[in-house]
């Protein structure tokens, strides 16, 4: 049976550019000599951003190590630092980053790795690796620094040696930034995948054990007081592997994602930590059965999501009950949803407003977002309103009174079908072979484009 998946995109032209909405590509980097992993063929992983000496920097991880670019002027971006990983090669899937007060902290979750600390305060002129050892930790999945307290939260920490060498969460004190010291360990769950922390109140993404909200403000190496669990959430719409999340600046709302195909992101009201409430769900709008969010960050009223196979997505959550799509850019060309591929990380906090994205297969991107641009997509509930039904066997109808011109292009960009002056008629595309197509619709001198997958 043929099946059509549709998403509507407003473009000024078709061309050979990636699918995008209100997004301008300012810089793209990838290095074909860097090998991909044996698991997911990803040469790249996390992205982070930094500002020092009035310069903007992008940090991206690879199977080789850590690459730092000066992206102050994106059109002439250059790599200004490279830190080789303690372990390298096809087994290295994850690296993660956070910086504080001139120091960049680096972890890796595979191989014979180390905690790496880099003095980046003199970039772009110089940098200095001040710590590179496995004596504190050998591997970790993610890290987050609570800037208000200078505490480093290490998720799923593995230490060297045998025996009890794993901590679901380990908190370190960064009073000495070049030599973190033990502050507290938390092992109430099997593991913590990721964390968002503000003033030592932590939102912990605990995989299949859901979300935990924990107060660590009264703990320390010389204090007998233990942590205080403020709330949890294990049963909610599209519950799966609770993967990551971010809070709004006022702390009233929290957006989280479950790393499962077909699972949508959730916006939570967390004004009462003891009773977090899911207000709405949303996703890219492309494939309700297969699309999968990875990492998301909230800045002002927008959620920026690295949405794996679908690329970068930006949603306006001014009204948390009705998130609206603002922009997107497809960083991953293939149309399949196999495994874990595509956009990995996103960083929206640079003073310029430019947004950094890392793609597992295609590398580093710097984007400019047009927040005032026109969009014909407001949210996922409206993405199927121009042509329907969806799914479809290729026989489509429209509520538009007139489509002046319809053109269908295959993956190579070849024009394979044209229809003119369609008026409340069925659109028969059942003759097309299974595959990926781009359809251009001209309606009242406006051009719309849509992705069409016929299966």
Regions found by a protein language model. Name each.
Residues 4-13:
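Sec-dependent N-terminal signal peptides
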Residues 368-388:
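Residue-level detector of functionally pivotal "anchor" positions at catalytic/ligand-binding pockets or at interdomain
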Residues 17-23, 41, 379-383, 392, ...:
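A short, polar/charged loop/turn motif at coil->beta-strand junctions and beta-hairpin connectors
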Residues 15-17, 447:
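Intrinsic low-complexity/disordered segments
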Residues 11, 275, 322, 388-390:
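Hydrophobic alpha-helix-in-membranes signature
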Residues 17-374:
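Feature marking well-ordered beta-strand scaffolds used for ligand recognition
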Residues 6, 381-455:
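C-terminal outer-membrane/trafficking sorting elements
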């Amino acid at each position: 049976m043929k099946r059509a998946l549709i998403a509507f995109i407003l473009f000024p032209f078709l061309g050979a550019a990636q699918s995008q909405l209100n997004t301008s590509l300012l810089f793209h980097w990838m290095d074909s000599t860097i090998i991909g992993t044996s698991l997911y063929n990803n040469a790249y992983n996390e992205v982070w951003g930094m500002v020092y000496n009035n310069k903007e920097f992008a940090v991206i991880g690879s199977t080789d190590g850590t690459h730092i670019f000066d992206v102050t002027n994106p059109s002439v971006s250059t790599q200004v630092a490279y830190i080789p990983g303690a372990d390298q090669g096809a087994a290295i899937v994850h690296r993660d980053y956070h910086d504080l007060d001139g120091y960049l902290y680096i972890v890796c979750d595979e191989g014979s790795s180390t905690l790496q600390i880099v003095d980046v305060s003199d970039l772009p002129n110089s940098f200095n690796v001040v710590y590179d050892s496995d004596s504190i930790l050998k591997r970790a999945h993610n890290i987050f620094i609570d800037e208000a307290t200078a505490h480093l939260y290490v998720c799923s920490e593995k230490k060297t040696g045998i025996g009890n060498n794993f901590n679901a969460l380990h908190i370190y004190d960064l009073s000495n930034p070049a030599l973190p010291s033990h502050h507290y360990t938390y092992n109430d769950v099997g593991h913590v995948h990721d964390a968002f922390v503000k003033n030592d109140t932590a939102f912990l993404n605990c995989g299949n054990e859901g979300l935990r909200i924990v107060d660590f403000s009264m703990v320390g190496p010389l204090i007998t007081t233990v942590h205080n669990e403020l709330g949890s959430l294990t049963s909610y719409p599209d519950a799966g592997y609770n993967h990551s999340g971010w809070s709004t600046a006022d702390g009233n709302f929290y957006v989280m994602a479950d790393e499962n195909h077909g699972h949508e992101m959730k916006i939570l009201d967390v004004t009462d930590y003891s009773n977090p409430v899911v207000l709405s769900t949303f996703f890219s709008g492309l494939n309700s059965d297969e699309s999968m969010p990875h990492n998301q960050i909230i800045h002002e009223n927008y959620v920026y999501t690295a949405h794996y196979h679908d690329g970068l997505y930006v949603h306006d959550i001014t009204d948390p009950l009705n998130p609206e799509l603002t922009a997107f850019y497809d960083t991953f060309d293939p149309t399949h949803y196999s495994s874990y591929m595509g956009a990995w990380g996103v960083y929206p906090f640079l003073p310029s407003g430019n947004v950094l994205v890392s793609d597992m297969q295609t590398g580093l991107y710097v984007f400019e977002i047009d927040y005032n641009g026109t969009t014909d997509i407001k949210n996922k509930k409206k993405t199927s309103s121009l042509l329907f039904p969806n799914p479809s066997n290729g026989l489509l109808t429209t509520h538009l009174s007139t489509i002046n011109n319809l053109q269908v292009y295959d993956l190579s960009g070849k024009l394979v079908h044209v229809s003119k002056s369609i008026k409340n008629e069925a659109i028969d595309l059942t003759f097309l072979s299974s595959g990926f197509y781009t359809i251009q619709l001209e309606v009242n001198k406006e051009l719309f484009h849509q992705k069409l997958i016929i299966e």
